[in-house]
Every structure is written in C-alpha cells, then in structure tokens.
C-alpha cells in the first residue's frame, strides 16, 4: 500500500513540476544578485543566468575563483557582470554587498541566496564559537541580505530565491548545528512570506530544498557518513532558476525530497527509515 501511495504521489509531483509555465525570456535583462558562486550549484546558477541574458552581480569568498566565473559569464553572453569578493561570516559585509549591487544595477529583480558555510559531519558536540560562525554564515547573513535588499525588491515586485537543504526540513544524524541554521532559514522565510502577503507586498519567496551539493567541500564534509550522491549542479541550478522565475513557493530537487518532507508528518516511521538508509551507520561519530 505504501509503495502504491508513493508511486501515485510521485506521478502527481512529476506532472506538477513538468508544467511550471517557465518563460526563459522573462529573465532577459533581469537584475540579479547571486551569492556563493565560486563552485557547484552557485557557479552553474551564474552560467544559466548569463545564458539567459540577465544582468549580474556575483559574490563569493575567494576572489580568484570569482574572477574565473565572471569571465565565463561574459563569454556566455551576460550583458553586465560585476563582482565583489565577500566573506559572509563578517556581520558588516552583507549590507555592503547589497549596496554594491544597487549601485551597479540601479535596483534588483532577484536576490538569490546560495552561499553556505559547511561543517564536518559526524560531530556530536561543537564549540559555541563554531556554532555562532555557522549561524552567521547560513542564517544571519541571509537575514541581513534580505533586509537590505527588500526595499528594492518591493519596488520592482521582485523575487527572493533561497537555496536551502533537506536538512532544513527533515532532521537527521550528525548535523545538528548546520541543520539548526537551515531550519531557522525555513522558519524565517516562511514567516516573512506571510508578513508580505498580509501587507500586500508583491515580493515572491521561493524556498529551494536541495540534496548534497555538487562541490568538493560539501562532499568532503560528509565523507564516510552518508551514501547520498551529490545532485548534478547544472540540473539542480536550472530547477532553482525555474522556481524563482515562476514565483513558486518551493522547489525540491531531486523531486523525491518533497515526498520525504511530507512523510515527516504523514508517516514518521517511514521517514525515519528513509533517512536511515542514507546514512553509513557503521561509521562512529567523532567525539
């Protein structure tokens, strides 16, 4: 019965995501501030936006990698590409990044929040200092960027696109500080969506629930802990862009993650079984 139910739900979700009315032309000339572009999905997001003719402000921590991505975006046809190297772990940086984007582009149509600070998996207890760093990188900087960009997005009736993780919806083992930051993201932006709706502010918020990032740092952080394979960067990035352009409230990639999130409430025992299958439980957690 469970298999039939999951199969039926899967077919419905596939049909839903297949017909999303995505119009690539809608992104031509769009003003986009994109964070975390030095590798993985962030880099692929930059390349997709460049091909679609968007005006870009790109940011990442490592300037040398950032410059390479900027050069590639120009080759792919982006009309305007600016960049600013920034460490989102510094509380004063997010506001400066948004102001730079506003100065260069004259406003924003999309704020795409993709940067992350990863922590090694398998650690039961982390120091308060490292946990504060994780919260600044993965939550507080998102709030700061949003707060600074919201007036411009309100003027343009734009969109907030938040790239998050399954760990912000479904708790799992060996990820407590990182998962806490991602749960905070989901709660903050879900509440903000309601506030904007009540105030009749036409700014869309798209929460993107992705799996393991297709980048070396993400894979290294969970080495020996999980059996999950990294999501292909180009495909995951396109799913994020489609969701943002169509003002969808949520994007799940791979799509089965939507089922897993539903199982959390509907079938908690089944959810726990699915999560357990993704773990290499023979690996002891670090002290």
Curated annotation (Swiss-Prot):
Catalytic class of the enzyme: oxidoreductase
Active site (UniProt): 178
EC assignment: 1.1.1.-
InterPro entries hit by this protein: 11-beta-HSD (IPR051253), NAD(P)-bd_dom_sf (IPR036291), Sc_DH/Rdtase_CS (IPR020904), SDR_fam (IPR002347)
Catalytic reaction annotation: cortisone + NADPH + H(+) = cortisol + NADP(+)
Superkingdom assignment: Eukaryota
Key word Ribosomal protein present: no
Residues at which substrate binds: 165
Residues that hold NADP(+) according to the record: 36-62, 87-88, 114-116, 178-182, 211-217
Residue spans crossing the bilayer: none
Cellular component GO terms held in the UniProt record: extracellular region; intracellular membrane-bounded organelle
UniProt signal peptide: 1-15
Cell compartments where the protein resides: Secreted
Keyword tags: Glycoprotein, NADP, Oxidoreductase, Secreted, Signal
Gene Ontology MF terms in the entry: oxidoreductase activity
Carbohydrate attachment residues: 280
Main location: secreted
Family of the protein in this entry: Belongs to the short-chain dehydrogenases/reductases (SDR) family.
Functional summary from the UniProt entry: Unidirectional NADP(+)-dependent cortisol dehydrogenase (in vitro).
Protein known as: Hydroxysteroid 11-beta-dehydrogenase 1-like protein
Organism: Bos taurus
